[in-house]
């Protein structure tokens, strides 16, 4: 499942200890000991949060595109190792791995065009060493979960040193109102995932069985096998994508949670985060992607300079 899943919910912690969860594509670590995700060098926030606080979580609960029938829901909590000391090697790995896992994304596109997209292919990798796992047969979370714990003393390698200078600012303006996100996604992005902070200080991401809009956010129904949720900061994520992963839609709202009954949680929304959603037909997706490139490409040289490295090239493996 870890190898074939197209998307995973990746949760990291802000400076204040609040969880932020973003859907991304998972890959098995090259040594088989970690589950890895990546983020673009030109939008490094997901990696920088993990560099500051390595406690992260992954939720495998979306089987679309995996060709797996009725896979279990798996929550992984672990320690992150951020890798950006060799940007060319990172880029080479991402080009190779993404072509193998998601061939439809670039099918039919000339290599000469793809080689110009180094603003996108230049990557920071986040290698996650699992410490704790829980799993259920389905998103319904029926019954107590299966559990696995890493051997005592398991540790993750240290992250590469943080680059000099300031992290680039956000490049997308967030929605002015979380209520607009609720209205816009109603009945369309119905798969919700909730992230809270566990008693051990790690993010904990869980699938929501069903949700009801409320005046101050949502009432979220979790399965009977869900762990108890303590009051505190929380993140609600909505996501959808076609099986070919030729587009995606993401929405994220942050706020707080409190218990509201048996397996029911009240999520009080505070604000919506900016999201990078590219949906529609192939032509629409291509145009939006090019527009994104015009905004992010100027950051590439600056981010490489911060790391005292050359701008990486997009190099495709020889057939």
Describe each model-derived feature in a short phrase.
Residues 1-9, 163-193:
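Short, basic/aromatic recognition patches
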Residues 2-4, 53-56, 188-189, 228-239:
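Short coil-to-beta transition motif at edge beta-strands of beta-rich domains
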Residues 5-42, 58-62, 71-72, 189-223:
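Short beta-strand segments
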Residues 7-8, 56, 123, 266:
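Residue-level detection of beta-strand scaffold positions
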Residues 67-181, 221-319:
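Charged, gly/pro-rich active-site loop segments
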Residues 135, 140, 148-156, 177-216:
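Well-ordered, non-transmembrane segments within structured domains
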